[in-house]
Amino acid sequence: MVVIVGGMIGIGKTTTSKMLGKETGLKVYYESVEGNKVLPLFYTSSKEEKEKYRYPFLLQLSFLRSRFHAIKEALKNDNAIMDRSIYEDYYFAKKNFELGNINEMEMDLYEGLLSEMMDELNLLPKKSPDVMVYLHGSFETVLNRIKERGRSFELDSELVSYYKFLYDGYDEWVHSSYKASPIISIDVDKKDIVYNESDKKEFLEELSKYNKIK
């Protein structure tokens, strides 16, 4: 079974993935944040530095590469919880293109690489995940959780408008463009599937419909 945990920055994907790994015994592939040298530069560099050094494009390539290798291994082994995945990667590239952080030539290159990677995944016996657990909540909740996890490079007040830009289109994109698997939608403002045992039990029962959890 391959389960993707998706949702906005800071919404609780890693915590949920860790819980799912413990409950199901599946291997957890965490988002490649630690050790990513480009990520803090993307958040902290000036507009001029971004334009000169192309940090937004480099970051997307970095994530695309790591997520491709992760989903490829996960699908081959059919035994994984994925903290974010290659399927949502395009959304972030698209939004940064809309903001002008990624130029047209870079976007064309990115889309070509992504298309080739998806073609390669389609050659595998298992071609897609079994289900996506989509975490969503209010924008206030997103901001609070970003602050709570305390990554210094994510906390600049000037980033709020960037987070809002991502947030405003996220839900629509997931429900209109994500086609790789069925979706289990969790409103984190209404349910706590990590720490509330009743909510967790209900969620795991729903998840078990996609594969038997022993």
Model-derived features: where do they sit?
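Hydrophobic positions on the alpha1 helix immediately C-terminal to the Walker A/P-loop
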Residues: T16, L20
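P-loop (Walker A) phosphate-binding loop of NTP-binding proteins
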Residues: M8
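Conserved substrate/cofactor phosphate-moiety recognition/catalytic segment
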Residues: K22-S66, A93
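A glycine- and Lys/Arg-enriched "phosphate-lid" helix/loop adjacent to the NTP-binding pocket
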Residues: F92-D168
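Hydrophobic anchor at the beta1->P-loop junction of P-loop NTPases
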Residues: V5
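NTP-dependent small-molecule kinase module
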Residues: L143-K214
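A basic- and aromatic-enriched beta-loop-alpha substructure that forms the phosphate/nucleotide-
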Residues: S66-M105, L109-Y110
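Conserved lysine of the Walker
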Residues: K13
